[in-house]
């Protein structure tokens, strides 16, 4: 079982219900901002540190995986450690989303917004009230000009429960009943695949898109280090933030 805690958040569960019940209409766009000043890390970048939970929630809300992933960002404090990234996910039926994460931001913000054809929903995990619906609509003047019709937001009541407690209760139920958990290994693998694809495009933006040294029969990611005296088999690939010690044999 994977610890994607937001899937156990009462507001996220209620948001999923709103989408499933058609309260927002057809989902057109979804995006999240996870921003703060710190905690700055040196062993992993902001994408791998902040984005996994948002990716997990998007997959859960849309019930599908993206057909295309791209990402770009900036590294300002440490070489090869991105401090901010913007990742774009493209799904079927023209649904798109983005995930903006940043640990060099002046204030804390944790929002996920779903834009539908009938209404828009905001999950704000920093606010006292967690879930809002904005029933804004678009009307067409003379069938040609789109006019926004604004409406007051509505606070959606959600159960007051700790997501971590909910997650642990779900884990206990899984152990007792041996039923498939909501965030199982397969769900974790889907998130990991998207993170990997996003990380690959980050390198592409830098002008160094995971180029393999053709003089070698194996590939070592630029964030990894291989000691002298290591044997690496042909076709092997060593990925992010690995340290291969002297005397090791791989492949």
Label the model's feature ranges:
Residues 43-48, 154-162:
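A short glycine-threonine-serine/GTX helix/turn-capping micro-motif
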Residues 217-220, 224, 230, 235-242, ...:
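A structural motif detector for beta-strand N-caps
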Residues 92, 170-215:
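C-terminal helix-rich "cap/oligomerization" subdomain common to oxidoreductases
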Residues 52-135, 158-161, 165-179, 196-198:
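Contiguous beta-strand/loop segments that form the cofactor/metal-binding neighborhood of enzyme cores
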Residues 23-24, 247-251:
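Short, intrinsically disordered, charge-balanced linker/junction segments flanking boundaries
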Residues 1-39:
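A contiguous active-site-proximal alpha/beta segment in oxidoreductase catalytic domains
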Residues 7, 106, 190, 245:
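Glycine-/small-residue-rich active-site loops that bind phosphorylated ligands and cofactors
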